[in-house]
Amino acid sequence: MLKALHFGAGNIGRGFIGYLLNKSGYEVTFVDISKEIVDNINKYKKYNVIILKEPVEKEEVKEVKALHLEEEDKVLDAFLEADMVTTSVGVSNLSSIGGRLKKYLKARKEKNEKPLDIMACENALFATDVLRERVVKEEDDDFITYLNLKVGFPNTAVDRIVPAVKIDKKLPVDVAVEEFFEWDIEKNKIKGNLQIEGVELVDDLKPYIERKLFLLNGAHATTAYLGYLRGYTYIHQAIKDDNIRAIVKGMQEEISTALSKKYDVDKESLMAYAEKVIKRFENPYLQDEVTRVGREPLRKLSSEDRLIAPLKLCSEVGITPNFILYGIAAGLLFDYKEDAQAVKMREYVEQFGIKKAVNVITGLEEESDLVEEIEKRYFELKGKLI
């Protein structure tokens, strides 16, 4: 049986990556920093994935185990035997995981000649490249030659909404997910024999990553931020608001036009994808809170993330953005007190004023036309709150 080692046993790890690997016949071992999650996985050796649709379905993920991140020797042993290593730890944790992988790979180089594929399954552009850069940093030619020959670092685009919805759990590690999923992998960087059900192997991943990051994640964040300002609790409520829906669809059209120009892709196929995204947001079973989707606004409004990157793309290909600016402005007004980044963002605005704050948060030039347009929408939306 093929063996997979997955770092990050959170909802995405269990409800998407681990679920799909297990379904594809892999023996899955999770690695996590949460003792509670690790202990529960090992206690029950299984969990249920509840698929939120009509009627609700349940699938059992069996014969799984878990290790605590600090169980170094056991994690190393599992790594030495693995055919595939995946992560869903959050982009900010990739550097520290990369440092650990470097140690494990050096040990594997001496003990196992089998090829290995390592994939970062994160909500970010080319996250596996980030992981690989950490692994190869300041390394000698011999180690890098080994990596080039035996270790694949394919980038991925992953997509499945895993909301923090309250469900009737039979086991503490049960997880609820939407029915839809997508997992695209760079074909030309694979070294081993990947056998994952439902995965698409692609020659050029960038259009897939940007389509997902901009048209799904960007639209999701826009719905959340506007929904928060209008007092909605859930995404499915917000997307039914005619004003919010018009802005979200408008920003998707702007982005689809830009992506079709950049990649010479049919705009209609991009708009069909965007329409599917809207339907997913409408699913009332997800009970997806706007505060969950909007969390960490400093990250979501950063230079290469879901809102600023497509804004810059529109500008680069000659499209005058309008609707996308409302999502950014609404994000800047996300003042949820339970979110440390939202609190920090308010401090930036109070300390610097809006234009300088936008520059600090997004990296956009303070005196640029784009920042001026964001400022206009910021005060337009803020005025409606008073």
Swiss-Prot record:
The keyword rRNA processing does not apply. One of its GO terms (cellular component) is cytosol. GO terms for molecular function: mannitol-1-phosphate 5-dehydrogenase activity. NAD(+) binds at A4, L5, H6, F7, G8, A9, G10, N11, I12, G13, R14, G15. It catalyses: D-mannitol 1-phosphate + NAD(+) = beta-D-fructose 6-phosphate + NADH + H(+). InterPro entries: 6-PGluconate_DH-like_C_sf, 6PGD_dom2, Mannitol_1_phos_5_DH, Mannitol_DH, Mannitol_DH_C, Mannitol_DH_CS, Mannitol_DH_N, NAD(P)-bd_dom_sf. Its EC number is 1.1.1.17. Keywords: NAD, Oxidoreductase. GO terms for biological process: mannitol catabolic process. Belongs to the mannitol dehydrogenase family. NCBIfam families: PRK02318.1-2, PRK02318.2-5, PRK02318.2-6. PANTHER family: ALTRONATE OXIDOREDUCTASE-RELATED, MANNITOL-1-PHOSPHATE 5-DEHYDROGENASE. This is Mannitol-1-phosphate 5-dehydrogenase. It comes from Caldanaerobacter subterraneus subsp. tengcongensis (strain DSM 15242 / JCM 11007 / NBRC 100824 / MB4) (Thermoanaerobacter tengcongensis).
